[in-house]
Amino acid sequence: MELYSLTIHELRELLKKREVSALEVTKSYLERIKEVEPKIDALITITEDFALQRAKEADEKIKNGEDTDLTGIPVIIKDNISTEGIKTTCSSKMLENYIPPYNATVVEKLLEEGVIILGKSNLDEFAMGSSTENSAFKTTKNPWDLSRVPGGSSGGSAAAIAADEAAFALGSDTGGSIRQPASLCGVVGMKPTYGLVSRYGLVAFASSLDQIGPFTKDVTDCAIVLNTIIGHDSKDSTSLKIDKPDYTSYLKEDIKGLRIGVAKEFFGEGIEEGVKETVQESIKVLQDLGAEIIDISIPYVEYALPAYYIIASAEASSNLARYDGIRYGHIAEKYEDLIDMYMVTRSEGFGKEVKRRIMLGTYALSSGYYDAYYKKALKVRTLIKNDFEKAFEKCDVIIGPTSPTVAFKIGERANDPLAMYLADIYTVSVNIAGLPGISIPCGLSDGLPVGLQIIGRHFDEGKILNVAYAFEQANKFNAKPQAIGGAR
Amino acid sequence: MAISRSEVEHVAKLARLKFSQEEIEEFTVQLSKIIDYVNKLNELDTENVEPTAHIVPIHNVFREDEVKPSMDRDKILMNAPYKENGCFKVPKIIE
Amino acid sequence: MKYEAVIGLEVHAELLTESKIFCSCTTKFGGEPNTHVCPVCLGLPGTLPVLNKKVVEYAVRAGLALNCTIANFSKMDRKNYFYPDLPKAYQISQYDLPLCSNGYVEIEVDGKVKKIGIKRIHIEEDAGKLLHENTDGSLVDYNRAGVPLIEIVSEPDMTTPEEAYQYLTKLKNILEYTEVSDCKMQEGSLRVDTNVSVRPVGSTELGTKIELKNLNSFRAVQKALEYEIKRQIKVLEEGGTIVQETRRWNESKGITEPMRTKEEAHDYRYFPEPDLVPIIVTDEWKEEIRKSLPEMPHHKRERFIAEYGLPEYDAKIITSSKKMADFFEKCVLEYDSPKTVSNWLMGEFSRLMNETGKEIDEVPVTPQMLVKLLKLIDNGVISGSIAKTVFEEMFGTGKEPEVIVEEKGLKQIANENELREIIKKVIVENPKSVEDYKNGKEKAMGFLVGQVMKATKGKANPQLTNQILKEELSK
């Protein structure tokens, strides 16, 4: 058993008993990274020196009895989360050399706990994409099959956890960017309720939808990480003041009488047979555990994807306007005048998908189209929100597949934006409604992982974790990706 | 086409993006497809529906009027491609 | 055909908060470039704004003082445009739901009171500053980026440049009174843009609107409008048409000229700011703010009449600026003759302020110094006319009055013997006037007093001079 293959709670036991040191744990992961990284390309930056130094500090903490659940645990952070003194590129040429002078609030929280940052992970440029192919630097490969995508946009974080490059990772989810790659890589990924985790320091894609969340190897770890990263932040006006629960207290196997909603809309067109079957088997598992399965309908959910593309692109067009080469980032070398400098800089710095969304968003907000597109989408957002509220009158959580397909081939959808957008069809509605959602591995289809999505009411992460944990205990997902070799 | 070539050119200018003729062509086709797709929303009657700009219904989030130290100028300017005399430098602007 | 002008004004006023609108950087004017900057006001990727509560309170205060309706529900929006002084490439402002709307101010022109409507007041952030001194590029300083502003948009209710001038004066006065802005145009804390069109008298249709920029003082606004209205009428009378454009006031040439702007039409793509939540001003909050409002000009004016016995004219002038009124009250606290103080403020003080173009708080004379000067007169140390000389020196140098009197030897000659010798000499040197006086010409007396003053360089005690002169002449 290699240290790198352990979960947070397993590592925690060893660290607490001082059977291993944080330095040993860190070195084990750094070795693992050297071994598998050339195959999967999950990371943009590896912070080896910083990690080793932090590991020594963590060991000090443990020695002095100042340790907590995450002290000495190595993490990988998506490269759109601001890390002071460490490049934060968003996988964009625009920010290739950008070094933030400040930490995101979540990073501050992790560092305070004594977490060890191993590196920054690859993503679709500015988190726009579902395959991590839109990175300006590298294409991350799915550890289960190197010819396939890990999903996106947090594909680097998902692949890193699947390949044991860290004990846990942080990602961001705007339309499915944590849950979908978690599903495709066979790991646990959660998007918390909008406003639960501070967005301060998360490079904005679509401000009203973005949310930071964890990738972990099991549900228990998800609860542990959540305990640390949530909480009100006075730097984020949309972060909520709620009492901090202990999410590990929800990790119970009992779900008797819990009402689980199954929406027919989540089994619609485009779903692969293998995915459908695996998820239906999972529903049976939950039923056998004593949950009540209720058929529900969320009729407006089919409008979530078009509404999402308008809202997210509109906000993105504004959020990404600041990249002009004046204060930071890429700047053009040759231009005629100021306006030309803006245009050349931005055209050189952004990749195609980013430009496509900026164009769509600018169009949707422009004079004469605002009401027809942006305002319309916000109204549809109201309908979807109400839809979920109605559904949650009948059930406690809603389950379904995270993604309509298993991991697809690299290049397969690269030239068809609409086909790519469909990868998020089951996840975007959750962002539109600001709800929490988790993806947990529930089986394999053709040797590739299938994810089960569990959606809850606002701030009902506890109940989601309860269902996820009960399912996990009853249906252990022990498979490991074979394409990279050398797992447990 | 849901969007014309000249509209694409106009939007590109608004967004401060520069495209070659081929790219304009490509964007016109792709954006048209996407716009056709999002036009699906027009199937819905939203006449009496209020738009939702903020999903979590909170209001009046303020900070007190307190001054805290600003950031060291070296750090503020650290990522600037061009700087001079403690300032960011841009091409000459004629007003 | 007779034409009339239609004038609307947009005023931006910086609010007097300690910190910026969305971050904790100081709002202090000046400072080395980019030293009042943090990741938030620099718009670094990932940063978020948090609204300064005082900004809302100050805007509501201004709204209440300007008779506005205060919105119960208000929100922030993004105004998108690219410019190097705008770090996020959008300005956080308010679009369709401003904090205050539908107010008015009353102005007085030719003895008549006129209401000028205020369409809206909204809050927003200021941009940074571009410095153009460099030869091969422009430099950007973001110290000012994120300083809170209110934008006050008038209805196009003004028809003459004089009305516009009166409106601005009144508005500035009220903003100063409410203590929400110091309104210093030279530091850019008050900025004015104006829209003007002309139309035939009697017509209800509006003419083509011209926007005027680079207006650095209220007088400049007035002069630019005068020029621009004449220009537009001339164009129309010559059969031409007005082209919608932005023109720039050229102060030295005294003309407006077209600005070299980029051709493209603005499309600000406003949308609700997702990073900030709505603002709800409850009735309770509004009343709390109303209670915190300082005394308004007309109340102060009435109080000055009742409490200090000032004539209405004096009270009006003294309260026309809050700073002047404050100065007055500080003086009166230590000096029990309000009318004397008001005479000085309206007289010498105002004259020198006009001459130098300085505001009362930019003058080195403090209320305590003026009181000292007045006491020097009362105690017979200096004469009233010498006091004016001393005051001028105080105004210029900020020296204490007694120091000036000492340094320049300006003390009155109140020694009877000394004065009598001088007077005797004057009588000998002016036989003609003495003759006239004795023949009943009272005016001659004045001339002789003048000669005594001249001989003593104004230092002769006037009462004593009169007394001795009469004695000597009747000898």
From Swiss-Prot, chain B:
It comes from the Bacteria. It catalyses: L-glutamyl-tRNA(Gln) + L-glutamine + ATP + H2O = L-glutaminyl-tRNA(Gln) + L-glutamate + ADP + phosphate + H(+); L-aspartyl-tRNA(Asn) + L-glutamine + ATP + H2O = L-asparaginyl-tRNA(Asn) + L-glutamate + ADP + phosphate + 2 H(+). Its EC number is 6.3.5.-. One of its GO terms (biological process) is regulation of translational fidelity. GO terms for molecular function: asparaginyl-tRNA synthase (glutamine-hydrolyzing) activity; ATP binding; glutaminyl-tRNA synthase (glutamine-hydrolyzing) activity. It holds the Pfam family GatC. Keywords: ATP-binding, Ligase, Nucleotide-binding, Protein biosynthesis. Allows the formation of correctly charged Asn-tRNA(Asn) or Gln-tRNA(Gln) through the transamidation of misacylated Asp-tRNA(Asn) or Glu-tRNA(Gln) in organisms which lack either or both of asparaginyl-tRNA or glutaminyl-tRNA synthetases. The reaction takes place in the presence of glutamine and ATP through an activated phospho-Asp-tRNA(Asn) or phospho-Glu-tRNA(Gln). Belongs to the GatC family. Heterotrimer of A, B and C subunits. This is Aspartyl/glutamyl-tRNA(Asn/Gln) amidotransferase subunit C. It comes from Thermoanaerobacter pseudethanolicus (strain ATCC 33223 / 39E) (Clostridium thermohydrosulfuricum). The gene is gatC.
